[in-house]
Regions:
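Outer-membrane beta-barrel "beta-signal"
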Residues: 156-169
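Sequence/structural signature of outer-membrane beta-barrel proteins
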Residues: 15-20, 31, 52-54, 66-73, ...
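Membrane-embedded beta-strands of outer-membrane beta-barrel proteins
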Residues: 43-47, 82-84, 100, 125-126, ...
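Outer-membrane beta-barrel transmembrane domain signature
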Residues: 75, 91-95, 99-131, 147, ...
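Short loop/turn motifs that connect adjacent beta-strands in outer-membrane beta-barrel proteins
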Residues: 1-7, 19-24, 51-60, 88-99, ...
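Surface-exposed beta-loop-beta
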Residues: 1-50
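Transmembrane beta-barrel strands of outer-membrane/channel proteins
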Residues: 8-14, 61-67, 82, 98-104, ...
Length: 169
């Protein structure tokens, strides 16, 4: 199907000074919503701010969420996540980032037979971004996925790893 989507997002970014050498974005608060020609609609929002705790060179706490009740368009109609990013945990590595996060996706109760029938899927994440030089970083990540895909099959969880390589030219 082809149709229109209408999205509105409002952002607020307080003007505060950043610590010298910070690579993290400033504080940001966002809220928005969308609607489509096919009765798809939803709300979303996020917030990012400095924790105020003496964590490394700089840090950010973040939370985000979304809700879209139409199962035909979204098998996971709700999401809530959050985390913490700390820059310069180790004094000799001021550009590195320690990343901690978690998320919870609520799965639709209106799922037809054969679809996931558990109420949620969740994830915990631990990552570390190594800044190798000004143009290259390496980010290994470890994730534990709870209740994978919401299936009723007894699966204790999935442990997964990944490595992201970023090169800026």
């Amino acid at each position: 199907k082809v149709g229109d989507a209408h999205i509105l997002q409002l952002n607020y970014s307080p003007k505060r000074s950043q610590p010298a050498g910070s690579v993290l974005p400033g504080e940001l608060f966002s809220i928005g919503g969308f609607t489509t020609d096919y009765q798809g609609e939803g709300l979303f929002g996020s917030a990012t701010w400095k924790s105020g705790l003496p964590l490394g060179l700089d840090d950010r706490v973040w939370i985000g969420g979304a809700y879209s009740p139409e199962f035909d368009l979204n098998q996971a109609p709700s999401f809530l996540g959050g985390g913490l990013v700390i820059q310069g945990v180790f004094p000799k590595r001021p550009q590195d980032l320690l990343i901690l996060g978690g998320g919870h996706a609520g799965l639709s109760a209106a799922a037809p037979p054969g679809y996931p029938n558990q109420p949620y899927e969740g994830v915990l994440e631990l990552g570390y971004r190594l800044q190798l030089n000004p143009n290259l970083n390496l980010q290994p990540t470890l994730q534990w996925i709870f209740n994978p895909s919401g299936r009723d099959i007894p699966t204790p969880g999935i442990l997964t790893t990944s490595v992201q390589i970023s090169l800026s030219l």
